[in-house]
Regions:
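Cell-envelope/extracellular polymer assembly enzymes that use nucleotide-activated donors
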Residues: 3-6, 24, 34, 177
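Acidic donor-binding segment of Leloir-type glycosyltransferases
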Residues: 22-64
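Short aromatic/hydrophobic "clamp" motif used to bind/position activated sugar donors
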Residues: 87
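The conserved acidic donor/metal-binding loop of glycosyltransferases
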Residues: 91-95, 119
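Conserved nucleotide-sugar donor-binding catalytic segment
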Residues: 138-212
């Protein structure tokens, strides 16, 4: 029997896109998965809608936060409830290729990987393609310091790695920080050179806030990785330039 994959989804006011996200999961050719949805909004107006959409999914858990905790802490709550040998992440407005899990799990087993990711497409709120992004085949800590080339919704990790390392509670770089911490452990990380996800760029997403990105990047380098002020500023500069090149050029 195939290994169980736990799919972690934080939800915060993504009603216009959520059904397409869940449809892309339910249509996966790899069928042995569980969805763990963390409802992270103290406003309960979308909760009935979320439950209705998830009726299509047999194996699921819905966790309702008492208050808004943020995506990092919410994902951690999902990880703690997960049972899968592998854990995959997807944001509540992104979309997967129907063969995403099948190809990724096969790729990880064939190459004895701990962590995998893929190329991805950036789409707008209407689903129109903005740009295709190629991720590097192999990522090491020293390369990751200068450029975050891993889309969260493309990531699948062996679950045992997330028992000791978790997401932080910063607003926009919580995934980047976790990838950095995991890469310091010299785990085997490799990308599939194939586009397996669609990452949705929305006008009101936290990841769209340039000021917030700068603040959180400094926290990643200076507070969490314990790098000095000057080194942190230099790395933020390179991270920003590489992000601009990747997204807009």
């Amino acid at each position: 029997m195939s290994d169980l994959v736990s799919i972690i989804i934080p939800y915060y006011r993504k009603k216009p896109f959520f059904e397409k996200t869940i449809d892309s999961i339910n249509s996966q050719t790899y069928k042995n998965f569980e969805i763990i949805l963390i409802y992270d909004d103290d406003n309960r107006s979308d909760l009935l809608f979320v439950k209705k959409v998830l009726k299509k999914t047999k194996n699921k858990k819905i966790i309702v936060n008492k208050k808004n905790l943020g995506v990092g802490i919410s994902r951690n709550r999902g990880i703690n409830k997960s049972k899968g040998k592998f854990i995959s992440f997807i944001d509540a407005d992104d979309v997967w290729n129907r063969d995403k899990l099948k190809k990724q799990i096969k790729f990880m087993k064939k190459n004895s990987l701990d962590f995998s990711y893929s190329d991805y497409s950036i789409i707008n709120e209407k689903g129109i393609l903005i740009k295709k992004i190629k991720s590097p085949k192999i990522i090491k800590f020293k390369n990751l310091l200068f450029s975050c080339d891993i889309a969260l919704s493309s990531v699948t990790i062996r679950s045992h790695l997330l028992r000791s390392e978790k997401f932080s509670n910063i607003k926009t770089k919580e995934d980047y920080l976790l990838w950095l911490k995991l890469s310091q452990k010299n785990i085997k990380m490799m990308g599939i050179r194939e586009n397996l996800i669609f990452w949705r760029k929305t006008n009101n997403s936290l990841s769209s806030s340039i000021v917030q990105k700068f603040k959180d990047a400094f926290l990643v380098y200076n507070k969490y990785l314990k790098l000095n002020f000057l080194v942190s500023i230099v790395l933020i500069f390179f991270l920003s330039i590489n992000s601009i090149i990747k997204r807009y050029l």
